[in-house]
């Protein structure tokens, strides 16, 4: 899963697997 990154909301209660680019843009603040 090199192309996937684990992203969570600010509470960390939910994790979703998105593309690394999506993770960078929407998964992290």
Curated annotation (Swiss-Prot):
Major localization class:
secreted
Asked if the record carries the keyword Iron, the reply is no
Compartment(s): Secreted; Nematocyst; Target cell membrane
List UniProt keywords, sorted A-Z.
Cytolysis, Membrane, Nematocyst, Secreted, Target cell membrane, Target membrane
Cystine pairings recorded for this chain: none
Q: Which GO terms describe its biological process?
A: killing of cells of another organism
Domain of life assignment: Eukaryota
Give the UniProt entry's GO cellular component terms. Answer: extracellular region; membrane; nematocyst; other organism cell membrane
Please give the function described in this protein's UniProt entry: Cytolysin that shows moderate hemolysis and moderate myonecrosis.
Q: What is known of its domains?
A: Circular dichroism reveals that this peptide has random coils and small alpha-helix conformation as main secondary structure.
Q: What name appears for this protein in its UniProt entry?
A: Cytolysin Oshem 1
Q: Which organism is it from?
A: Olindias sambaquiensis (Hydromedusa)
